[in-house]
From Swiss-Prot:
Residues 1-105 are annotated as: Disordered. It holds the Pfam family FAM194. The gene is ERICH6B. It comes from Homo sapiens (Human). Residues 32-44, 54-72 have a biased composition (Acidic residues). Belongs to the ERICH6 family. Transmembrane segments: none annotated. It comes from the Eukaryota. This is Glutamate-rich protein 6B. Residues 1-10 have a biased composition (Polar residues). Residues 73-91 have a biased composition (Basic and acidic residues).
Amino acid sequence: MSAENNQLSGASPPHPPTTPQYSTQNLPSEKEDTEVELDEESLQDESPFSPEGESLEDKEYLEEEEDLEEEEYLGKEEYLKEEEYLGKEEHLEEEEYLEKAGYLEEEEYIEEEEYLGKEGYLEEEEYLGKEEHLEEEEYLGKEGYLEKEDYIEEVDYLGKKAYLEEEEYLGKKSYLEEEKALEKEENLEEEEALEKEENLDGKENLYKKYLKEPKASYSSQTMLLRDARSPDAGPSQVTTFLTVPLTFATPSPVSESATESSELLLTLYRRSQASQTDWCYDRTAVKSLKSKSETEQETTTKLAPEEHVNTKVQQKKEENVLEFASKENFWDGITDESIDKLEVEDLDENFLNSSYQTVFKTIIKEMAAHNELEEDFDIPLTKLLESENRWKLVIMLKKNYEKFKETILRIKRRREAQKLTEMTSFTFHLMSKPTPEKPETEEIQKPQRVVHHRKKLERDKEWIQKKTVVHQGDGKLILYPNKNVYQILFPDGTGQIHYPSGNLAMLILYAKMKKFTYIILEDSLEGRIRALINNSGNATFYDENSDIWLNLSSNLGYYFPKDKRQKAWNWWNLNIHVHAPPVQPISLKINEYIQVQIRSQDKIIFCFTYEQKQICLNLGTRYKFVIPEVLSEMKKKTILEAEPGPTAQKIRVLLGKMNRLLNYATTPDLENFIEAVSISLMDNKYLKKMLSKLWF
């Protein structure tokens, strides 16, 4: 507030108000303000007339300005007397005006006026109460400025009463009516507040108090400055701004500059009043009233000059209604102008968005309903049947299937035929099919590999099963008299036999396909192996020095006794006269408890005896009927021929493959092979040299 008061005291404002046509404005002096306000009112009212009337009126205004300059120094007493007289006339004329216009009959506007008058009056009192202290201090220090403030107060709160004096001099009653209508516009809020209190005398006293106190000038000027800074510009603002004449482009005299600045301030003040609107409140009513006023304004231009007064009065009445309906609260509008503008924009955007969304939703709903209707037609009849009806149909079909079998099959064939007809197939027949040319390739005859399946001897599994019954037990321990384990045999044929000392004598193992392995051990803690025997015809016995004592296979047998003649025989060739099995048996005594006798392939008897206890097992094997071809081969096998081991057998196979490759390879292939081998050998030598250099 202090900054605004300092600006009003005569200093230029730091941020001058901006308007669409003027970039900068200077505050006028006291006398200039009065002249500007009076001239602006006359110019605004006479703006709808023709350009010739405007030029005459401009001359009259210049004369009026000279008269007003003479009357400025008459004093406060004359204005106070005129105020009382004019105040009474104002109230009488306003009542007549209100009765004619019919505003008193409209209850809605009266309620709005009462509400707005209450708020505006209370806020003005609060605002004036806050500024009393600051304004009184400035009032004491500035006596010369008080006269200016008094004059400005008279002009602001008397409702442009100077226009009434000018009209009395000119004798224009129609102009008085227009001025009274304008007074009603500016003082409507204060009058409604006084009407609520039902004290017209109190209203006059308040006006006099306002006139006497200089604080009102500050408030009025601050109001004008705030309105000048407001950025809002509605349709009513544009029309009021255009009424300002542009003939004051050369501000040589002081009165012309004052008039221009005062006119701008008053136009901004009215623009701010028009902008203090809530567009959400009776927006349609305001638009209708405005359109009505515009149409009536167009009709007034066509009427005679005598009818201009009545049309202008009617236009002023409608503009009065517009401004009254748009003003909710003057002080709230000053402080919240930008906020109201943002709210209006948000409202418009929300309104458009909501209408667009509703239309979009309705379209989608219609499309969905249309799709649902289309889907209803595609529902098969089976889905429409209820569960009970379907169940009944199934029962009837089961009972009467034979009767309707032919019809059901006919329907199925028809449906299948329909499905086949729906599937279209295009077939193309060429006149002549091109025969694919096969590349000529030299046929290389590969050698036919003859695979000789090795015929093996097959064991007699039935005989082996009967033989193993002997050493199948129930898994019970049989002990010696000294409580050591004697033997334990299990139902699957496995078991153990122990010496009286407790050492293991024989271990019987079982593998798949009824393959048993018998291991005979020495009676010692070391437990050296004395014999390995299996039921496939292979066996090896070792003497005390761990040398081979006897070796048996499926074809041959070797016996290497000490200090005796060695024997070798073929089990399948009995023409060789050798004193060996199966002609002559061989007995081997391993220790005092174990003795083995070899009679034939199927009779290798193992005996374990201790005092009166004895266990005898047959460790031999028997083969099925041998084919003569196999038998002849087995007979031809020499006795001293060594059977190759697994590694030797692999080497023999590889050598045979190499032999076959060399037989069918050509000389160029061999030459290429030799070159590749020589290169690889050279590379190996070079690598070895490099490695040797690296190490050393």
